[in-house]
Amino acid sequence: MSDETHHSPDGKMSIRKLSYLAVGSVGVVYGDIGTSPLYAFREALKPVAADGLTRGEVISLVSLMFWALTIIVTMKYVLFLLRADNDGEGGTLSLLALLMKTANGHTAVLMLLGLLGAALFLGDAMITPALSVLSAVEGLKLVTPTLSDYIVPISVAILALLFAIQSHGTGAVARFFGPITAIWFIVMGLAGIMHIADDYGILAALNPWYAVNFLMNEGFLGVVVLGAVFLTVTGAEALYADLGHFGRRPIQWAWFVLVFPSLTLNYLGQGALVLREPLAMSDPFFLMYPHWALLPVVILATMATIIASQAVITGAFSLTRQAIHLGFLPRMEILITSETNTGQIFLPSVNAILFFGVIFLVLSFKTSDALATAYGISVTGAMVVTSIMAFEFVRVRWNWTLPMAIAVLTPLLLLEFVFLGANLLKIHDGGYVPVLIATAFTVIMWTWRRGSAILMEKTRHTDIPLSSFVSSIERKSDHSPAHVPGTAIFLTSDPESAPAALLHNLKHNHVLHDKNVILTIRTTNKPRVPQEDRYSVEKVSDRFSRVELRFGFMESQNVSQALATLRKTGLKFDIMSTSFYLGRRKLVPDAKSGMPHWQDRLYIALANAATDPSDYFRLPANRVVELGSHVII
């Protein structure tokens, strides 16, 4: 999908375009939730079946799954959250960027919540590919038991290939993701319809009383079961995160016309199968199909899980770029893999981290049964964070009264906290994995944000105001620097101060260019910046100008390209007579930095690992001059 496609007003969308986007959203938005039937019902049956399985328990479990889909996915995400957008974009960091502008006194709390939500999503991006691919490949055991020993090697090979092709981009095959996943949903729905006839009594699961009665009577077992039932709605966060790719209406249409009916029918079919044949609880999904259809279904399931994994990986790339632009992570290499769509990106460092994390999980847990216990915490945590931030959103942006916000969102929050509590019971069985991953990412992002703020404050105390510097340097004297032809552009984060690179250039080279541009790059709290708002130019003196370039947090920051548009303002920009001056700082830890020593060390390590700004901002390598300095943090 191109960026242009994403932002058509929903109200003016033709039926043809709506259908096209709806099918596309099935592969990207619903890929993850579409793989849940592979393991969700099976995992929910296990704790209940320990002392024998009754008819009422099977119906109650399916009822819990149906109403989880109805309340959390349909009501919260499809009908409510898809309207809480930031200029068409959704997701935790997009919501955070919007709220930070209007936060009143609790910025730090909001920021920490947003970072936690982003970190939980990155943890989910490791677990989802491992679990979904394993669960699909395990279907081979039913085709022929001799393949049991090859499940892990085959899964590792598929995942290795998936991560290997990321650098080449997936645009060429992405057009097939939606149709393939749509076929997957249709096949699941048809299988469900066929097996509902096994026992029409399963239709009683649509009555919420079965779900409520089960939780009221089963006590602690009911809480344990909720942890498995929650697997039904994993992937719901993708609805919100991918809002900007397809728009609200196509995502809603896809849910109500195809995805929700197919999931409901499949879970009802699995339930009816187990009612008729209790031994089918060992793998109710694959046992719905006749033996001759098993291999094609396993192949289709594997394709569906690969597509779901691809969607999560792409989401991780997009989220990381947002985090970099919003100042939560250091610069990383961002490669655009499409000549026509700047939204198709590849981050080598993120790809490597995800790859090693996913392979480690597959080799450590070995089965989808074991890995399913680790799943859920990251997703429930992210959902709770989103709901809390949505509470702030409706108060600030929609002007809801406090009682109204409490009345609408408190029931959802309470339900999600119950699910979170149920998943936390699995900490010792592998649930610690997403907790550790999320903690690590949160600490990294918080450290970078805090360290950057401290560094900015320290350098500001020693900086020379730009106006004072220009006044003194342009006074005629015997010590005036020599003037050289051309333009010098000095990148700085503080446009009010003379850049360190400018001062070092004068100190060591004793020259000043005919034209000097103090350039600041700003990331706004909007996903994209209109071309007319891209830049502002302020003339400081005959030789000095102050320029600010603005980018949205979803945009690639191609500075050379943006500067070319400045010719309209009369600021001549000839790449062959322009030099870019960058300051490179060597950071030295200080006992009085305001952060613990280990955090100082972490911040310095992150700064040293950051991508060179000349590469990140797409500056011509042969026109860049770097001047270094030591800074104590």
UniProtKB/Swiss-Prot annotation:
GO CC annotation: plasma membrane
Membrane-spanning parts: 21-41, 61-81, 107-127, 145-165, 176-196, 219-239, 255-275, 293-313, 345-365, 371-391, 402-422, 427-447
Broad class of where this protein is predominantly found: membrane
GO molecular function, one term: symporter activity
Keyword Membrane assigned: yes
Catalytic activity: K(+)(in) + H(+)(in) = K(+)(out) + H(+)(out)
Keywords from the named record: Cell inner membrane, Cell membrane, Ion transport, Membrane, Potassium, Potassium transport, Symport, Transmembrane, Transmembrane helix, Transport
InterPro entries linked to this entry: K+_transporter, K_trans_C, K_trans_N, Kup
Domain of life the protein comes from: Bacteria
Subcellular location as annotated: Cell inner membrane
Membrane topology recorded in Swiss-Prot or TrEMBL: Multi-pass membrane protein
PANTHER family, A to Z: LOW AFFINITY POTASSIUM TRANSPORT SYSTEM PROTEIN KUP (PTHR30540:SF79), OSMOTIC STRESS POTASSIUM TRANSPORTER (PTHR30540)
Family indicated by similarity: Belongs to the HAK/KUP transporter (TC 2.A.72) family.
Function (record text): Transport of potassium into the cell. Likely operates as a K(+):H(+) symporter.
Protein name according to UniProt: Probable potassium transport system protein Kup
Gene: kup
